[in-house]
Amino acid sequence: VTASARLRRAAALTAVAAATLVTLTACAFAPTGSDAGSAPATEGALQTVAAGKLTIATGEPAFSPWVENDDPASCQGFEAAVSCAVAEKLGFTKDDIVWVRSNFDSAIAPGPKDWDMNVQQFSITDQRKQAVDFSSPYYTTTQAIVTTGTSPAASATTVAELKNIPVGVMSATTSYQVAQDQLGTANLSVFNSNDDAVAALQSGQVDAIVVDLPTAFYLAGAVLDNGKVVGQLPDSSAGGDELAYVLPKGSALTTPVSDAVDALKADGTLDQLQQEWLGGTAAAPVLK
């Protein structure tokens, strides 16, 4: 073997060794699993209750205009439609969503949850933030008085006129807080659900109920005989109440869900869905 051949063989061995070292080094430092933190969030990367699925809770029952026909999986109704759009932004299809039901009070109580996010007109409050996380708001609403045309409340134009009238409201809600502040507690009846409050109005147990404005218009037009939206309560009409998704405290999904809501707001989807499902809810006088 000549000296030049020996040199060529040594150079080849050196090149192979260098290539092997580069390959091993690249493998050692390649991000895997949770180490690949700089990668964009995808369905597979999100931490959810059920792998590859997004579990969304809503009320039992869920009412229009928020959920049509108590069927959130249809993506019909404002909150159902927004939720399907949020899921899509997160990388989930409509079929990847698992819809479950939950009690309103338990959803905002401390402790573990068996869902990823919950949607049933939750207002953002500092007190609730101590127990759960909130996403960015997807809608801003006000609180309103709804009644029937034969009720003494139907002709009211001021808050003072309503203070001596039996009024119903659902417990542990922003509607209850506003009703308590504006109307006092002497004639305020508290119920476990809006369903119960509506039944009390229909039976004559109360003369009016307090609900958010879109729900008031829905009840007046589709549920109550000769229903009427008396007006908005003044304390809730300046700025309004921000509705958002509730997530378990410290959830890894809080930021991705907020980002999805923000993106839907920026691209006009939220406005479009609001017009489609809540478009007729603006014309109600503010009670003085």
Residue ranges and their predicted role:
Residues 28, 80, 85-89, 173, ...:
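Extended ligand-binding regions for polar small-molecule ligands
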Residues 36-118:
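Extracytoplasmic small-molecule ligand-binding "clamshell" domains
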Residues 27-38:
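Bacterial lipoprotein signal-peptidase II cleavage site
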Residues 96-161:
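Acidic, polar ligand-binding/catalytic clefts
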Residues 56, 75-89, 122-123, 140-196, ...:
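Bilobed "Venus flytrap"/periplasmic-binding protein-like clamshell domains
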Residues 22-26:
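C-terminal motif of bacterial Sec signal peptides marking the signal peptidase cleavage site
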Residues 106, 122-131, 180, 207-239:
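A ligand-binding cleft/hinge motif common to bilobed small-molecule-binding domains
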Residues 60, 140-147, 221-262, 281-288:
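Periplasmic-binding protein-like
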